[in-house]
Amino acid sequence: MRTSWLQAREISRYAQTLTYSLEPGATQAVRYPSHGPFDQRMGYTRLPELLARLQQNRFVIEQQAQFSPALLEYTQRGFFTPYQEKTQAGLFINDCRAESIHDYRYPQRHYERFEQIPPLVVSALLFIENRELLNNEQPLANPAVDWPRFAKAAMSQLGRALEIQDDSAGGSTLATQIEKYRHSPGGLTHSAGEKLRQMISASVRAYQQGPETLEARKAVALDYINSVPLAAAPGHGEVHGLGDGLWIWFGTELARVNQLLDPTQNKDTPLAEQGQALRQVMALMIAQRRPSYYLFRGRDDLNTLTDSYLRIQAQAGLINPALRDAALAQKLNFRNFREDPATVFIDNNKTLQVTRGRLASLLGLSLYELDRLDLSASTTLNAELQQKVSDYLHRLADPEFAREIGLFGERLLSPEKTADVRYSFTLFERGADSFDVRVQTDNTNQPFDINEGSKLELGSTAKLRVLTTYLEIIAELHQRYGSKSVESLRQLSPDRQDLLSRWAIDYLIRTPDRSLPPMLNAALERRYSASTGERFFTGGGMHTFGNFRREDNGRNPTLIEALRESINLPFVRLMRDIVRYSIYQSENRAQLLEDDKDPRRQEYLSRFADREGQVFLLRFWRKYQGKTTEERLDTFFDGLRPTAVRLAAVHRYLMPEASPEEFAAFLQTRLPQERLTEKRLDELYTRYGPGAYSLPDQGYIARVHPLELWLLSYLQESPEATFANAAEASKDERQEVYGWLFKTRHRSARDSRLRIMLEVEAFSDIHLRWQRLGFPFDHLVPSLATAIGSSGDKPAALAELIGIILNDGVRLPTVRIDQLHFAAHTPYEARLGRLHGQGQRVMDKEVAAALRNALSQVVDGGTARRLQGSFRLEDGTPLVLGGKTGTGDNRIETVGRGGQVLSSLARNRTATFVFFLGDNHFGTLTAYVPGRESDKFRFTSALPVQVLKGMEPILRPYLQPGARSQCQQQLAASPEPKEAGMIKSEG
């Protein structure tokens, strides 16, 4: 007794110093566990990398638990951190109104308090595992050590070592078992040292509340019953705790077992059911010793052992003979996982899909791992509004509702087609330092998100990007020339093909008011022909383009008219001017088009090749940086307009060792609609084999920059190379790429090749501009067709561009997750919020204002005029609206030698409207039909415009100025923690 008193006093006194507190900001005074199944599942072992990852993604640690010096020293010695651990935790998510949208608790069935456990369950556990645990006669007892049991186990181990005993008895108490399966590596005891660590850790934990341990010992029993590992079930995963164990392995609910085994509740329940419940509880208590055996192959042995323990318990007077006999008469009936899977159903609503998917991506975890983290998070989504919009989009499949909304008519839908259209909607709100996503939903009920997860040809929405680039160039020219005198301007002589520079200089010469806004307005009033009669040399060949309406073909509209009415040819011609401007901004590039016999060209070309080659090599390096070989090739081929010749040239260059069979399989996969005979395949394989063409010729044939082709090949051979390695290795290739210009006899052939290469380089420049404004892909298709959508886009990325325009040219981070709270009420607690700061100016505010005005005209009298006057505030004040429409009819076409279309296979049809609603809200709405069925549809962007118009009554209450979409500012992602200290968990 004296020893127990001394032990209790000294350990409890020491344990009182092992504290932690929640402090502002980040701290280094914390030690996270490095192993242990419990710590791994809860995410505690991963917290260092998760916190670092989040800080790289614009999160900041606002509060973090800090260890006392004593606790820090204790854990540095390798002992497990003492605190009242959670037996149930999981992912909890709030929406922007602080309303719960997900509350996943694992395990799902457990006891909140010791008093809730039926005495029969406790006595069964203690009889099997730790009979003296709750002995009232020893108030100071250490639950970590059962000395008689420990001595017996030690003798057993000695006997086994001397080979005089076959099996050894275990000496673990429930307290040390909990330490083992929660915190030891792999949940196992690998050595005597590990056993000692478990015992010391359990002892300190037991005495942390004081020298008397009865309540701590009750907590041990409660924790064990709630958390004991019971193998992994098919289709479910890990099973922990008696409650989940009963349901998963036997299909029995914990509440029913409690009723059957509680003498105050079971008087009217059949004895046979009581016996079965007791048998199941006993079986799981026994099975925990070897769960993966007893719960699968060893079920007969488990039945036999359960019978034995039932008899022994009856002999000990713990159960009466009638209950014993009732239990012995039963057999364990395990769940048939094929016929009755133990599936955990998670609400599949779009709010949850979006948020869980975003969280998993943010943390680099699977959804299974994510749900089991000890984590609370908040999203910027408004779940109430999202549900209303989702319901609305689903109802559009009903012909009667679609008719009510006005979706039938020319360039819209017919009643029999309403169910085949998919709709996707995203709504953002402009905050002080972020673009907050309030709604992100569709009517597909699928995790895949059309807004973010797709590359779609969205047609005329690309005109917004082209017009943005154009106005940015005008602003650049204003900055360059706006302060020069008229005389100085008259001395300038830009190239005759650089029409944008020429216009800017002429404008500044003749206009007294040299401020930027009038110049931008004048630039929007420039006229471009809509004629379809011209053939354009672009993308390596001659192309013609058409307008949507034939009556536009004879027009000569201003750019703002062309945007308002979405006329194609003015934007194709504008893109040509932008390409030429880009070419002539580099003096080196311009010189290539000058005198073919200039003797300085060779020396210049060498310098040009080295300098320009490195510029483009770096761009391509960044394009492929961090990608695997397969991802690099996918990215490359996505940007290549596929023909048999181009693909053959690229494949034979990048994979020279490939067999004819591999080569044929590659072409047939990439060109499923093209019939390639064996003879044609052999011809291509031979003609473009290694050494048949130089690197520049290979690039010319494939219509790609030769250095991009070279870099792909180099990275295949040297995947660990740095950019410096690549630059050094490509010295000769950089000279070769540009040197071929002087080896062709005819200047026209030289100029033709030069124009192709310069166009590729110009589109690389343009891509940098687009990327700065949120363009989501690694490349643009180097063709004027990019002006009308051939490079693809994502609706969400276009919406971000609208946000930049609405925000006076300042790009803010797009936010869906704004608060994270890990490990609440534990020593590992950490709260993170979004890093607040200034946005990035990516556009002159004058350019943004000009674009807002242009987009407003699309609604006031253009392709989105259906919306005119439709959105009003609650007091009747009309909202200022603007946007851009676009329709994509995406096909795979086979073209004959004469240019005629031989076959046309529909891939999908899209219609998109990107918009702003008032000063703070913006977004995108897309109608989409995938696959060949899209050939039956003729809807245009009038469809999403009409759908948005029908949504007005739903959106109106959330668009009020200052209402923050009916969201509230959240201080935390979960309830405020209890006072920091030693006991800090829920249950």
Q: Which residues fall in each region the model found?
A:
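N-terminal type II signal-anchor transmembrane helix
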Residues: M1-I101, E400
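Non-catalytic, structured segments within soluble enzyme domains
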Residues: M1-S12, T17-T19, T27, E137-A141, ...
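Flexible glycine/proline-enriched surface loops and loop-helix/loop-strand junctions
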Residues: S34-H35, R105-Q108, M199-Y207, P263-D268, ...
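Extracytoplasmic
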Residues: T45, E49, E85-L91, C96-E99, ...
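Acidic helix-start/capping segments at beta-turn-to-alpha-helix junctions
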Residues: Q64-T81, Q138-L162, L196, L242-G245, ...
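Acidic/histidine-enriched alpha-helical segments
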Residues: A141-W147, E238-W247, L302-T304, Q315-F334, ...
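A penicillin-recognizing enzyme superfamily signal
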Residues: T379-L427, V437-E452, V466, R510, ...
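Short, glycine/proline-biased beta-turn/loop segments that scaffold the active-site neighborhood
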Residues: L458-R555, Y693, G699-P719, L812-A830
